[in-house]
């Protein structure tokens, strides 16, 4: 699963996830893409599950790019622990997602196959998505 090798700080503030994606909002590497249309956060497990679903459906032909990386630690306290006594331990990593962000890209496969693969991947994710095709200028 994806997570940073090392970070400057172990734990972060919760923060807010506002606005629209102004970087990573266009298909750059492949021909087809899966773009988020809603706001949320994707866990490293969700990103990996979607990647596996796509890879298996296209039978490892073509190329897949993952355009998101979970670099925000989420902490949790153990069950039945009283409030206070410091911030909990890092349990998993997430990537904050804003509407317009391209999550995955694919190339080297027919459009129909790419649509099917992205539909399988979208079912594994906690944000709404749409299928996009690279615009040629």
Curated annotation (Swiss-Prot):
Belongs to the universal ribosomal protein uL16 family. Binds 23S rRNA and is also seen to make contacts with the A and possibly P site tRNAs. It comes from Aeromonas salmonicida (strain A449). One of its GO terms (molecular function) is structural constituent of ribosome. PANTHER family: 50S/60S RIBOSOMAL PROTEIN L16, LARGE RIBOSOMAL SUBUNIT PROTEIN UL16M. Part of the 50S ribosomal subunit. GO terms for cellular component: cytosolic large ribosomal subunit. It comes from the Bacteria. SUPFAM superfamilies: Ribosomal protein L16p/L10e (SSF54686). Residues 1-17 have a biased composition (Basic residues). This is Large ribosomal subunit protein uL16. One of its GO terms (biological process) is translation. Residues 1-24 are annotated as: Disordered. Keywords: Ribonucleoprotein, Ribosomal protein, RNA-binding, rRNA-binding, tRNA-binding.
